């Protein structure tokens, strides 16, 4: 009799655990954190946050924006001014769309009548602004990272040295780099001798 009661109790306990697991939300942890802050997975306010926004309303008629929405975007785009983020969120109504715009490299404008040079900024934005010398904000995605580099100097390749008899498989990584640069330069020299159009471009 006691064995059957124990068996029924165990079945009930495992049944409850199984049902809990089965009906548990299979959201990603970041989506669960967003729902806890009052923003849904699409970046729109929900629950008590949405009710509070409905009560307060927006003066300019745009989408309602919470400070959590602005902070979420600011964490991903620290070089944007909070007013740029707020204005974009008022237009799109979604954190997700605003972040996608940022990742695409779209321009973020300030609200009409807003003076960016007089606005309070975070420490990072102030440093960037001072470095730029004024009201322009630096965008690290728009820096030109391409610069001409002389590979002969970089890998210490001597063109007078004859490397044609070296075996590629026997060399270490640095020597292979030197050999590849040397071969590319020699191939260019031979091509320049035969191709008059290419020669005219370089002279």
Curated annotation (Swiss-Prot):
Instruction: Name where it mostly resides.
Output: endoplasmic reticulum
Task: Recite the UniProt keywords alphabetically.
Answer: Endoplasmic reticulum, Membrane, Transmembrane, Transmembrane helix, Ubl conjugation pathway
Cytoplasmic topological domain ranges are 24-203
Q: Which CDD domains match?
A: CUE_Cue1p_like
Q: Which residues form the CUE domain?
A: 65-107
Q: Name one GO molecular function term.
A: ubiquitin binding
**Which InterPro entries is this protein grouped with?**
CUE (IPR003892), Cue1_U7BR (IPR041158)
What topology does it adopt in the membrane?
Single-pass membrane protein
Any one cellular-component term (Gene Ontology): Doa10p ubiquitin ligase complex
A biological process (GO) of this protein is:
ERAD pathway
Q: Which residues form a coiled coil?
A: none
Stretches in topological domain Lumenal? 1-6
Region annotation (Disordered) maps to 36-61
Q: Where in the cell is it found?
A: Endoplasmic reticulum membrane
The residue ranges crossing the membrane are 7-23
**UniProt function note:** Component of the endoplasmic reticulum-associated protein degradation (ERAD) pathway. Recruits the soluble ubiquitin-conjugating enzyme UBC7 to the cytoplasmic face of the endoplasmic reticulum membrane where it functions in degradation of misfolded or regulated proteins localized in the endoplasmic reticulum (ER) lumen or membrane via the ubiquitin-proteasome system.
What does the subunit comment say? Forms a heterodimer with UBC7. Interacts with SSM4/DOA10 and UBX2/SEL1.
- Per the similarity annotation, which family is this? Belongs to the CUE1 family.
Q: What additional remark is attached to this entry? A: Present with 589 molecules/cell in log phase SD medium.
> What protein am I looking at?
Coupling of ubiquitin conjugation to ER degradation protein 1
Please state the gene responsible for encoding this protein: CUE1
């Amino acid at each position: 009799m006691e064995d059957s009661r124990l068996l029924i109790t165990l079945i009930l306990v495992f049944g409850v655990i199984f049902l809990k697991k089965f009906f548990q939300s299979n959201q990603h942890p970041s989506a669960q954190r967003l729902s806890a802050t009052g923003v849904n997975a699409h970046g729109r306010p929900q629950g008590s946050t949405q009710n509070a926004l409905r009560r307060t309303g927006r003066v300019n008629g745009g989408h309602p924006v919470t400070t959590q929405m602005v902070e979420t975007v600011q964490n991903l785009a620290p070089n944007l001014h909070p007013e740029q983020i707020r204005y974009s969120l008022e237009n799109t109504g979604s954190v997700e769309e605003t972040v996608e715009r940022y990742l695409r490299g779209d321009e973020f404008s300030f609200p009409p009548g807003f003076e960016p040079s007089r606005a309070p900024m975070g420490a990072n934005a102030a440093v960037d602004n001072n470095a730029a010398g004024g009201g322009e904000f630096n965008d690290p995605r728009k820096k030109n990272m391409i610069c001409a580099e002389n590979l002969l100097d970089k890998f210490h390749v001597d063109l007078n040295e004859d490397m044609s008899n070296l075996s590629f498989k026997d060399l270490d990584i640095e020597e292979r780099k030197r050999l590849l640069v040397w071969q590319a330069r020699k191939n260019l020299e031979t091509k320049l001798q035969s191709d008059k159009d290419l020669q005219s471009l370089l002279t």
